[in-house]
Amino acid sequence: DPASVLTPDPLPLSVPYRDDDLLVVDKPAPLPAIRSARQGTHTLENAVYAHLGCPEQFVYRPVSRLDKGTSGLMPVALNAHMHDRMQRLLHTEEYVRAYLAVTEGAPAQDAGVCDLPIGRLAGVKRCIAPAGKPAVTHYRVLQRAENGRALVYLRLGTGRTHQIRVHMAA
């Protein structure tokens, strides 16, 4: 299984910030963030491993992950201490997860909060589910197009799998 072996993938990475404890990578779409049997070795995890020079004691510590089809800044802690600090910060008002999305169909309101629980549908699919986990997405429509699409600014209050997709489809 190629996913079980860490394999350097020398992709050209855009790294807008790096210090001894933290690396911030501009993850391109459609690059997967982590290795898995389905993704093979072409992942951000393998690219970061190569970027850091293939250290012997490498542990991949993403602070949060972006879906395969999502591009954006993704923080990766370079040690356990920073990972713990960032994980604590992740659930505070100080850590802002904001996105721009083009939606098929525009939200009815120009701005609002989608506060609907998200649960598992089948496998990795997610949906609005009364018994699901709480999920909060703040949104503001920046531009509406004649074709029904919209450019929407989104800020996550929680970080559920596929939260933006599920909430924008609700």
In which residue ranges do the predicted regions lie?
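RNA pseudouridine synthases
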Residues: D1-A170
